[in-house]
């Protein structure tokens, strides 16, 4: 997959990913931040994407993993505060 095709696919799933991010976060601003972080991570790891595999599934996995990592970080920080 060339860079143009990758970015075209990335733009095509943005709206759907935003809805998924909102379901995860229940907050518009956090959903936008999660979408942006996911898009940047995908662009940074474009070379790791295997062409002819499920691009949308790959993006959902990145988003879910970022959300889980952020959640764990928040819980860990709250544990230290208490």
State where each predicted segment sits.
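A short, charge-rich alpha-helical start-of-domain segment used by transcription regulators
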Residues: 1-19, 32
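Pre-signature/interface helix of ABC/ABC-like ATPase nucleotide-binding domains
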Residues: 7-8, 47, 78-81
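Structural recognition of an alpha-helix C-terminal capping motif at a helix-to-coil junction
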Residues: 19, 33-40, 44, 53-65
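Acidic-residue sensor for enzyme active/binding pockets
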Residues: 30, 37, 77
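Short alpha-helix-to-loop micro-motif enriched in aromatics/charged/Gly
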Residues: 49-51
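Arg/Lys-rich amphipathic alpha helix in sigma70-family domain 2
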Residues: 61-81
């Amino acid at each position: 997959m060339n860079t143009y095709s990758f970015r075209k696919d990335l733009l095509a799933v943005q709206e759907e990913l935003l809805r998924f991010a909102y379901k995860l976060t229940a907050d518009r601003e956090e959903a936008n931040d999660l979408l942006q972080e996911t898009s940047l991570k995908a662009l940074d790891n474009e070379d790791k994407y295997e062409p002819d595999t499920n691009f949308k599934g790959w993006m959902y996995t990145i988003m879910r993993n970022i959300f889980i990592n952020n959640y764990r970080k928040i819980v860990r920080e709250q544990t230290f505060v208490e």
